[in-house]
Each structure stands twice: as C-alpha cells, then as structure tokens.
UniProtKB/Swiss-Prot annotation:
The protein, known as: Phosphate acyltransferase
Gene: plsX
PANTHER family: FATTY ACID/PHOSPHOLIPID SYNTHESIS PROTEIN PLSX (PTHR30100), PHOSPHATE ACYLTRANSFERASE (PTHR30100:SF1)
Top-level taxon of origin: Bacteria
Family to which the UniProt record says this protein belongs: Belongs to the PlsX family.
EC number(s) per entry: 2.3.1.274
Record has Electron transport as a keyword: no
C-alpha cells in the first residue's frame, strides 16, 4: 500500500455465528494483518475485549459496544425490537459513514433485515439478493449463484435485476471480461419451467444490458459453462446447501474407500497434495459467504459456521467489492433504460 491509498475501514459483527466472538476476532485480526484493512469490532465489550487481549490487540482495535444479540433461531424482524444489537449497530456504522462495509455471520435473515432497515436499497432496486460463490470444474474459476436466500418468493422483475447485478459483479470484481448469465431451470429449451422462470426468461432475452446465455440446468451450475446463475432465494438456498453437502460427502467417501493398512497409508501419502487441493477447491469457507447485492452499502453475510479463515475470506470479499466500486457500477447501470 502506498502513502496515497486510503485504508478501508470495515465494521464486523463480533457476536454473530456459531463461534463468536473467538473466531470472529481472530479472523478480523488476520484480515488486518494480511489485507491492510482497518477493523471495528461490534458487540459486547465484556466478551470481545478478553479476546483482543489474548492476541495483544486490545489497544489497537476499536470496539463499539452493542449489548444486545440476535440469536440464530430468532425471526428477522426481531432487529426492530433490538436496536442495540450487534448486527444493527454494525449496519449503523456503515449508514453513518464510520465504516465503508459491514461483515456479519449468523442469522442471515436478521442481517438482511438490519441492512434494509438501516442502509436501505439502492434506488431502482426492488429486492436485494445474496450472491454466493461456488467452485467449478475449471481450475481457478468460480460461479456466482444468486439469490441464495434473501427472497424465498420472487418475481420475474426481481430475477432480471439479480442477473444485471450479478453480471456487473462478475465483470468488475471477478474479472470476467464477458460473463455468461444463466437462468436456473429444469431444461435448456425456451419455455421450460414454471411461470416465474418462463416470464423471467423472456425479460432477460430482451434486456440488452444483461449478457444472457440461456437456461442453466442443475447439472451445469458448477461445470464452468456459466459465470452467473440466477434463481429465486428458495431454490438458491437449497442448491447452495446441497452443493456444500455433496462436497463433504465426496471427501468422506474418498477417505473411506482408500485401502486400509500399509497400502492405504502409502496411497494417502502419495495423494496428500492432491487431496489437499481438492479440499481447498470445495471448501465453502474459502469463498467468504455472500455479498448482499442491491443494498446501499457493501454488506457481506458470512456462513453461520464460519471460523477465522471464513471471516478472513468474508472481509477480503468486502474489500474487493469496495476496491472495484461495485455499488457505483450498479447505480450507473440502473440509470440506463431497461
């Protein structure tokens, strides 16, 4: 970083997720060291401060005290009754300009509700979408799947906007020069699917600002054929969790099927590097959770089970979105006629 570059400041909900605050604090400190970002930890000072002391960082990291918490099982609307919860205060910091991005693990619905209540939608966007990265058969290539849970019920117009935002994200953040957008469907042919998907297809075909490449069947999501795959939040969430489960099952089957005894140990030794690479490519923690596209601020919703590396990845994702001016580019595109 040179002397002319501005340090990115990111607010992190230290109380969200299964391993808060220990893993959240550790991941945030890793991000500060590796990415050069400035971090603000939001949560119960009584819980967060001892963790910072364990890492000798109590004097160098700001804590914003937020005494209330939102549990994993609570309804999203509970955030209205908990204005001092860590997730609401995290979003407040972005709204007030005290942070440029927010990162939160834990209750996805509550995080999205807090972002909408505090930050609001981008002008022209009817519904936000959560985008998640999945690995593909092509080494180094990822596919952006959205929506993965922000809207269980959707409309054709929403899917059209998801496609536009996803294409812009793929182009400017992921570096795909000519992204191909697919619509998740039960067949490749035009006219396939339910009314929602069929109507969305016709809208996407006619939209000159969306690089629409046609329907995407479930088997093609992770082949690398598409750069962006669009669907409603119900289907996207099911698909995302199915993909995560398949990865875990595949690795476990591989371990169980290797020969036992000395031959098995020799085989594992010979394949150690390959197995490590397979695990790394299929590890959801490496992808940092999902970017909440369509809100008037950069918000990353990490997996509820995120540990330190997952939080580091989520913060990296936030920094990439800021560095590549995702919000500005989406706003510019929305000005164009659709």
């Amino acid at each position: 970083m040179n002397g002319w570059e501005k340090t990115v400041r990111i607010a992190i909900d230290a109380m969200g997720g299964d391993y808060a605050p220990q893993e959240i604090v550790q991941g945030a400190l890793l991000a500060r060291a590796q990415l050069g970002v400035d971090i603000v930890l939001v949560g119960s000072a009584e819980a967060v401060l001892p963790e910072l002391r364990r890492h000798n960082a109590a004097q160098s990291v700001e804590i914003v005290d937020a005494p209330e918490q939102v549990g994993m099982g609570e309804e999203p609307t509970i955030v209205r009754r908990k204005p001092n919860s860590s997730i609401m205060v995290t979003m407040d910091l972005v709204k007030q300009g005290r942070a440029e991005a927010a990162v939160a693990a834990g209750n996805t619905g509550a995080a999205m509700a807090a972002a909408l209540f505090r930050i609001g939608r981008l002008p022209g966007i009817e519904r936000p979408a959560i985008g998640a990265m999945l690995p593909t058969l092509k080494l180094g290539k990822r596919v952006l799947l959205l929506d993965v849970g922000a809207n269980t019920d959707s409309r054709p117009r929403f899917l059209e906007q998801f496609a536009l935002m996803g294409a812009l994200y793929s182009r400017y953040v992921l570096g795909v020069a000519e992204p191909k957008v697919g619509l998740l469907n039960i067949g490749e042919e035009r006219g396939k699917g339910n009314e929602l998907v069929a109507d969305a297809y016709e809208m996407l075909v006619k939209n000159p600002h969306v690089p629409f490449a046609g329907n995407c069947e479930g088997r093609d999501v992770m082949t690398g054929r598409f750069d962006v795959v669009v669907c409603d939040g119900f289907m996207g969430n099911v698909l995302l969790k199915f993909a995560e489960g398949v990865g875990l099952v595949a690795l476990q089957i591989l371990r169980e099927e290797l020969p036992r005894g000395i031959p098995g140990k020799i085989g594992i030794a010979l394949m150690r590097n390959n197995l490590g690479q397979v695990k790394q490519r299929m590890d959801y923690a490496a992808y940092g959770g999902g970017l909440l596209l369509g809100v008037n601020g950069v918000c990353i919703i990490a997996h509820g089970s995120s540990k330190a590396q997952g939080i580091l990845s989520a913060i990296r994702l936030a920094k990439e979105a800021l560095d590549n001016r995702v919000l500005e580019r989406i706003q510019q595109q929305l000005i164009l006629p659709m």
